[in-house]
Amino acid sequence: MNPEEQIVTWLISLGVLESPKKTICDPEEFLKSSLKNGVVLCKLINRLMPGSVEKFCLDPQTEADCINNINDFLKGCATLQVEIFDPDDLYSGVNFSKVLSTLLAVNKATEDQLSERPCGRSSSLSAANTSQTNPQGAVSSTVSGLQRQSKTVEMTENGSHQLIVKARFNFKQTNEDELSVCKGDIIYVTRVEEGGWWEGTLNGRTGWFPSNYVREIKSSERPLSPKAVKGFETAPLTKNYYTVVLQNILDTEKEYAKELQSLLVTYLRPLQSNNNLSTVEVTSLLGNFEEVCTFQQTLCQALEECSKFPENQHKVGGCLLSLMPHFKSMYLAYCANHPSAVNVLTQHSDELEQFMENQGASSPGILILTTNLSKPFMRLEKYVTLLQELERHMEDTHPDHQDILKAIVAFKTLMGQCQDLRKRKQLELQILSEPIQAWEGEDIKNLGNVIFMSQVMVQYGACEEKEERYLMLFSNVLIMLSASPRMSGFIYQGKIPIAGTVVTRLDEIEGNDCTFEITGNTVERIVVHCNNNQDFQEWLEQLNRLIRGPASCSSLSKTSSSSCSAHSSFSSTGQPRGPLEPPQIIKPWSLSCLRPAPPLRPSAALGYKERMSYILKESSKSPKTMKKFLHKRKTERKPSEEEYVIRKSTAALEEDAQILKVIEAYCTSANFQQGHGSSTRKDSIPQVLLPEEEKLIIEETRSNGQTIMEEKSLVDTVYALKDEVRELKQENKRMKQCLEEELKSRRDLEKLVRRLLKQTDECIRGESSSKTSILP
């Protein structure tokens, strides 16, 4: 083993240098990069001689900070009487051999002096340090330090530079820099201080713990790890604590399952017979907690079975991946119900607190219930950390290594999904429980369960401006809401009946990722932009399922072409068709659509001809009558043999041909009427639209005053006119509001002026009367 490898192994064994996950190809370059800022060196000298460096820069950003750290290390090395190097040798990396020589000498000196180190020296360092921070208690601290330090020396002389202790009692942290430990935990001490507090590392986390809560581990009890190896006897640079970490996973999993079972048996099951809560409230509070509890016990047993095999045959990652579908179903369901449970806890906090305390819980009982119901979320977050720690101490060639990596990704994804679902359900509960501004129709609570909800950006018609909306999907209707200006509530923006709608994907068009549009007979063209692909797929799936249901009349279109056909005005009060009405199938328009279908009865042919003659007379007066007639004749009818014979007559065919010509002429002239008509009808859009190939020449004035001629299709022109009408209405509304405010201000000003004039007049009269009384 060359000197560079020896130094790396030594630093890792002392815990001052993080163990690399991969094999080191060039130990010298690894050492240069690791030691350059001086942080590792300061930790090293503090580990070998506690208190040598009181303060150093943990995150050096400049060259001066790095040089200062290196100088602090060299000052500590001066007491060891070893040859030191120049700080620039390390920072520049030029004479790195001198740095290696110094580190080797430090290692040799500390090994030789370890068994001969006097207690008085260490205690004097500690006492001096204490006297600086607390001069009044320096004497007492020195005496106690002498007694405690002698025991510390005995513990550190146990064949290793690393002090390893085992917890005798449970300790729960009260500050962020403290370390929570359970009885039996193995702790690697990183710093020994006076006052009864030591710093140590447990499961990758470093913090302070009381020294009288632990005991020293003898050499025979220590786990096989780099920190238990003396000197340079271990060649591999990637030693780990795989067995210790795995055992910690098993222990914490057992404890977690035990806590869930205790909460279920002691509190939740007796709560079901409590009369203070209704059955619905108890169900909302419990959710699927019992299923989660049962699943965790199954998981605990499965992990124990995996750990019984030899280490090179462990399949912890494979076990977790096989149970991942159950993880998702259990925890997603629990997260979806948790906002409802919190709502019950808030509404019945007094009753639940009294119940918990009657069951033996310490005061406040509601806090224990709230904390325990949140433990599944905290445990889900810990899975990622535990698996990352296990993977860190696992060889790349281990058969379970790839599964561990996949499990880490799966748990991260699940954790993100659970967080998003909780936020979404919490927002959903807020909307359902609070009044909605400008709401129309029946109460939102009567619409049933919310199938899906998310925040999206929408575009109406041909308008390019995007508006933020919250879409809530129910079984029969899609509700659109917007947030109030101060985010204090929600404003009703309309509803879209599911029946009669068409959903078209637009994600295949470049620039329209996660985008779809909604059209239909009672729906204005609405383009929906989702925030992410997951919401996009969920919307398509749920809308597709409802539209293709037995009561629906449309299908999901996956074409990404310009969908301009069959666009009608959006109405917030539009009603879906009745159950007995025929389905309205949207087809491309052509002149063949105008050909009349045969009547159901032969006798209806004569009545049909009479009605047609009357309609032809009326059509010259009002084209609207003809449009209504065309709209009613969309229903398909099945021909019969008798009808076929009647239709074969020459007179009937000639009359039908004349009627068809009249209708075709009417529809052809619709283009001229739409382009040069007096005005656009207010609340309706033509039911029969000409093909997109027919264009109109529109004269448009830009904002800069420039007038241009632009060619637009009939559909685009109609929607552009509709948008202009809507903007004019909004502008008119704003002008009315401004006018009302102006009138109100004028009235207030008039009242103020009158009041001031009145006061002035009274003052003048008072002064004149006083002068009159003074005169003789």
UniProtKB/Swiss-Prot annotation:
DH domain span: 241-421
InterPro entries reported for this sequence: AlphaPIX_SH3 (IPR035788), CH_dom (IPR001715), CH_dom_sf (IPR036872), DBL_dom_sf (IPR035899), DH_dom (IPR000219), GEF6/7_CC (IPR032409), PH-like_dom_sf (IPR011993), PH_Cool_Pix (IPR046376)
Region (Disordered): 115-151, 561-581
Domain PH: 443-548
Biological-process GO terms, alphabetical: apoptotic process; JNK cascade; lamellipodium assembly
Compositionally skewed regions (Low complexity) per UniProt: 561-572
Protein's name according to its UniProt entry: Rho guanine nucleotide exchange factor 6
Gene designation: ARHGEF6
